[in-house]
Amino acid sequence: MGPDPAWPPVLVAEDLLGAGVVAAFTGRVGGSSAPPFATLNLGLAVGDDLRRVLANRRRVATVLGLAGHPWALARQVHGATILRVGTGRPGAGRPAAGRPQADTVGREVGTAAARGPWVEAGGLGQGPPEGKAPLGEADGLVSSEAGVVLAVLTADCAPVLLADPEAGVIGAVHAGWRGLAAGVVEGGVAAMAALGADPAAVVGLVGPAVGGCCYEVGADVREAVGDRYPAALATTRDGRPALDPAAGAVQALERAGVGQVRVAGECTVDLAGRHFSHRRDHGRTGRQAGLIALVPSGTGGGR
């Protein structure tokens, strides 16, 4: 199956982050995967053909002008752990400040080295050696090194991309209801601050996620998130209790002092032609991504 030309493979956030940052949210169209992963599936752990997934990733990287740069992905567990990511190369990017520090939810900000073009946590799919290098379990990544692509994979949860362009610090957060309730978004901002970012100078981008129109939840889930983020409380079209993860992420960013927040405003369940949705497709589906990288000014071909 050849690449699907019907839609651009990425939604690029333009003119928000300056020339030194590339950020994008991918959709489901523009790749080479077959149903039920058609077509731009970027997840290795869903049962898709490995060669097609890697081809899809390479296509996205090429469009963004990031071909050959290492991708950093953690094993996402719907928690609040944040990892600091670097290439391990002496002198790469801006120097990192200090030792690992505690984030706002009391977990240590770990350190991991990204080796190879597709860095995955251990156990995420079967692939070549570069597909097995572990970053560990985490739902947020931060970095101050140029050339490292931070990536979070989603299929209903909210992908949150963060950047302080002046300080040269970026972050990517996977925010589902459990992560929201645990404070993963604020943890990502705090981890960036530990690397020298100013929350007031941070730009936050919240990508496509399941909307309150379609995300019916039980009373326990609604309470766990709604008690912390009332903005996340919603009602489905037929009047049932629901949550809006993107709205919760926005409120979390605002509480963390993030200076500018933009929201994609697209529901992954509603827009079946544009996005993968675990809920809509009963778990048999692909993964889209939120991607962000620091790059030298003037690079980043997709901008």
Regions found by a protein language model. Give the residues of each.
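Active-site microenvironment for binding and transforming phosphate-containing groups
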Residues: 1-303
